[in-house]
From Swiss-Prot:
This is Heptaprenylglyceryl phosphate synthase. It comes from the Bacteria. CDD domains: PcrB_like (cd02812). InterPro entries: GGGP/HepGP_synthase_I, GGGP/HepGP_synthase_sf, GGGP_HepGP_synthase. It is an enzyme of class 2 (transferase). Homodimer. Mg(2+) binds at residues 14, 40. It comes from Anoxybacillus flavithermus (strain DSM 21510 / WK1).
Length: 231
């Protein structure tokens, strides 16, 4: 956990999206603190292994965010397990997690596994549809989910996921002020350095994903925006 607490900026790579070797090198050598491999659909064991092998040419830490049990493979530094707190489907609250432990319990290195308390806040994103997330939540609802993540479940990470939409900075601030030990991850709609810097004022870790595939050079600038010129 010690290394994860130092992460300020993370790039998320989707195994189901194309990225050239040159582009991948720019991402991995950008100064970002880590790479998370994960996606909502089209994630297979084959494309996860392929992307892992390509990322492993670089020294940047690499985590797999598990969305499909069949795509789990050894070789990552960390394994992030999303638990969607505002899902109406038990699959994303406990069933998948139970099945994963049933299949791989004897093989799991628990020091490498971290559960993320997810709160999906964009009703139009694929993740909300897939997980049957209740996205018409109030500010009080989100803060309650954050408190549950920290004080009831003792999750190391609370993840505010806007997935393609730039989120509510004021709400991110309020959630951050609520949390004491659990780290606040923010992801969604960051396409410019200015947006990244704004969210980094409150989020412990800013996750940049889609921008890699829409405007790579702008995405690369988010590293310095979050971490400063030493990145």
């Amino acid at each position: 956990m010690n290394e994860i607490t130092t992460w300020r900026h993370v790039f998320k790579l989707d195994p189901n999206k194309e990225i050239t070797d040159e582009q991948l090198e720019q991402v991995c050598e950008s100064g970002t603190d880590a790479i998370i491999v994960g996606g909502t659909d089209g994630v297979t064991l084959e494309n996860v292994i392929d992307l892992l092998a390509r990322v492993r040419r670089f020294s940047v830490p690499c985590a797999l965010e598990v969305s499909d049990i069949e795509a789990i493979t050894p070789g990552f530094d960390y394994y992030f397990i999303p638990m969607v707190l505002n899902s109406r489907d038990l699959t994303w609250l406990i069933d998948l997690h139970h099945e994963a432990v049933k299949q791989f319990g004897d093989l799991i290195n628990w020091e490498e596994l971290f559960v993320e308390g997810y709160c999906i806040l964009n009703d139009e994103c694929k993740a909300a549809s897939l997980t049957s997330a209740r996205t018409n939540v109030t500010e009080e609802d989100v803060i309650a989910y954050a408190r549950m993540a920290e004080h009831m479940y003792h999750f190391p990470i609370f993840y505010m996921e806007y997935s393609g939409r730039y989120g509510d900075v004021a709400l991110v601030e309020k959630v951050k002020r609520t949390l004491e030990r659990t780290r606040l991850f923010y992801g969604g709609g960051i396409h410019t350095p200015e947006q990244a810097k704004e969210m980094a004022m409150w989020a412990d870790t800013v996750v940049v994903g889609n921008a890699i595939y829409t405007n790579l050079q702008m995405a690369l600038q988010t590293v310095e925006a979050v971490k400063g010129k030493s990145a």
